């Protein structure tokens, strides 16, 4: 390792200084990137925020509701495990559909099913019914696997790809981060049923964004 370090010190690319200088000249401020991509980060980013809020909320509401109807920890574990297993089995099919038909073919069904599942939680008064809700949540999250990362990569401008995706991820994490305090606050001061219906309402807003405002970014430029 010492020899490799010495070699790396004495051997350098003749274009290294030029590339570093070029990157400094073409760098943009975050505010400039936001301004130039205000539709992608503002409008499409709102859809991203909502979808990740719904995705994270399922990890919070399902356990709380399970204990609310008197289920034991092992029953909750089975529900969560089956839901996650279904989620993972859909990774590859979701990617295939995105590349074959378009990004919205996975993101739109995903947010519709997520919203539907949250509307059904209040009626899940038994293990079997909550298991069914968990299955729907697993399917809905699975078919949307990678959709938002792919959408962000499609929308990212070539001259500021990294910073754009950094902002994109920040929006995504913000949606995920809001789920716990939102569900917890509504559940504590009002009711857990109202919390699930509130998430459903937010989901319906997200459906409008994904159906009408989020563009299809798949570009089929290859020859058949």
Locations of the language-model features?
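Helix-loop boundary and gating motifs at the non-cytosolic
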Residues: 40-47, 51-69, 75-77
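Helix-to-loop junctions at the C-terminal end of transmembrane segments
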Residues: 90-102, 187-188
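Juxtamembrane intracellular "pre-TM" segments in multi-pass secondary transporters
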Residues: 12-45
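Intracellular juxtamembrane helix-capping segments at the cytosolic ends
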Residues: 143-156
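A late C-terminal transmembrane helix in Major Facilitator Superfamily
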Residues: 161-189
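A membrane-interface helix-boundary motif in multi-pass transporters
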Residues: 1, 185-203
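Structural signature of the two symmetry-related core transmembrane helices
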Residues: 105-120
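C-terminal membrane-cytosol helix-exit motif in multi-pass small-molecule transporters
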Residues: 1-20, 206-214
């Amino acid at each position: 390792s010492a020899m490799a370090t010495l070699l790396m010190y004495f051997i350098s690319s003749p274009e290294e200084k030029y590339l570093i200088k070029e990157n400094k000249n073409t760098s943009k401020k975050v505010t400039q990137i936001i301004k130039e991509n205000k539709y992608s980060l503002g409008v499409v980013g709102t859809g991203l925020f909502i979808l990740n809020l719904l995705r994270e909320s399922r990890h919070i509401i399902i356990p709380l509701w399970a204990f609310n109807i008197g289920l034991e920890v092992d029953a909750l574990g089975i529900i969560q495990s089956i839901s996650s297993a279904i989620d993972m089995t859909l990774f590859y099919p979701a990617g295939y559909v995105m590349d074959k038909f378009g990004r919205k073919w996975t993101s739109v069904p995903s947010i519709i099913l997520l919203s539907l599942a949250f509307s059904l939680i209040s009626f899940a008064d038994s293990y079997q019914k909550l298991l069914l809700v968990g299955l729907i949540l697993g399917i809905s999250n699975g078919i949307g696997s990678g959709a938002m990362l792919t959408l962000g990569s499609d929308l990212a401008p070539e001259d500021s790809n990294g910073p754009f995706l950094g902002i994109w991820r920040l929006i995504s994490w913000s949606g995920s981060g809001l789920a716990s305090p939102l569900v917890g606050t509504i559940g504590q001061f009002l009711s857990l049923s109202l919390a699930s219906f509130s998430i459903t309402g937010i989901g319906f807003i997200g459906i409008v964004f994904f159906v009408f405002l989020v563009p299809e970014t798949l570009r089929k430029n290859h020859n058949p």
